[in-house]
Amino acid sequence: MAIKVLVVDDSSFFRRRVSEIVNQDPELEVIATASNGAEAVKMTADLNPQVITMDIEMPVMDGITAVREIMAKCPTPILMFSSLTHDGAKATLDALDAGALDFLPKRFEDIATNKDEAILLLQQRVKALGRRRIFRPITRPSVAPVTPRPTTGSAVGNATTPVQSASAPVRSSPLSSIRASGKQYKLLLIGTSTGGPVALQKVLTQFPANYPHPILLIQHMPAAFTPAFASRLNGLCKIEVKEAANGDILRPGCAYLAPGGMQMMVERAGVTGRIKVLAGSAEMNYKPCVDITFASASKAYGGDVLAVVLTGMGADGREGARMLKAAGATIWAQDEASCVVYGMPQAVASTGIATQSISLDNMAESILKESARG
């Protein structure tokens, strides 16, 4: 049975365009369209769509308000459309905080190499959300106010890798069973995609300011969004969070977010770690790419790495995690039940690369426990 989709946008042209693309896929069916947030809230209650695509700026009721109301009344997976501007990035992050699960630039052909790829990209994102077995809104972290620090750095998820099917679900480890290995680490890596902004916020806001290791964050995200996302995390977290810049020296208690549209690598000069930011190759599906950062860390840090793969579509991170494991590093994955899309974590869990499958609720405490001896 086709996944039922509600398309919401104040532009009749965009409603028609999105509907045509969605309906080209036999696994998808647009059951209705709405021209503002108020209509979307009512139609969601009346029609029970499985996925909603939502614009942000609309008359009567904007998209962010509509997301909040839908999540309060009849929670449904929502894909936001956003402009590639600073204000658009901020609004999109607000929508994700309100409960939306994923986003695409409104001109989504800008993050694809051709028209066919753009069509496939939208279809896959909608299907990824519609395939969730049970929709449960992710519990938003309760964050005590932290005095924001200025971000010290400067200022796309454009892959069309099919969603990985969970053919052999991996059992999640309860928190009580997760024991610190006693290993000594020098670096924490976290890679993620769909659902990652909320997941990263939930994990990182629980870290103390004196977290003992540098942290590299690889989130599939357009270049226009990563500065705003790093700034937002920096204001919410006790640790420092910045967008990575070429030549940054790694410091304990600082998280470095890979810039959108670029590749982030790490190298060692004696005991000092240093970031290299390089232009992303046109042939690479992911910019930034988890595999590239993980692979560079395997060469620079060997087994002194704890690498975590969080929610995301596709299999980015699997090959880099394989290299890390061969070097002696520890690999963890988010469990299926707490993922927005169980693609990237499943790719490392079902192949035996990950040694633990941990729920998002338990991930921060598990990382802190494992890092304590570092």
From Swiss-Prot:
SUPFAM superfamilies (UniProt xref): CheY-like, Methylesterase CheB, C-terminal domain
Localization, UniProt: Cytoplasm
Record key words, sorted: Chemotaxis, Cytoplasm, Hydrolase, Phosphoprotein
A single Gene Ontology CC term: cytoplasm
Keyword Cytoplasm included in the entry's annotation: yes
Keyword Membrane: no
GO biological process: chemotaxis
Polar residues: compositionally biased ranges: 149-167
InterPro entries: CheB-like, CheB_C, CheY-like_superfamily, Sig_transdc_resp-reg_Me-estase, Sig_transdc_resp-reg_receiver
Stretches assigned to the Response regulatory domain: 4-121
Its biological purpose: Involved in chemotaxis. Part of a chemotaxis signal transduction system that modulates chemotaxis in response to various stimuli. Catalyzes the demethylation of specific methylglutamate residues introduced into the chemoreceptors (methyl-accepting chemotaxis proteins or MCP) by CheR. Also mediates the irreversible deamidation of specific glutamine residues to glutamic acid.
Family under the similarity heading: Belongs to the CheB family.
This protein's domain notes: Contains a C-terminal catalytic domain, and an N-terminal region which modulates catalytic activity.
Annotated protein name in UniProt: Protein-glutamate methylesterase/protein-glutamine glutaminase 1
Native organism: Shewanella oneidensis (strain ATCC 700550 / JCM 31522 / CIP 106686 / LMG 19005 / NCIMB 14063 / MR-1)
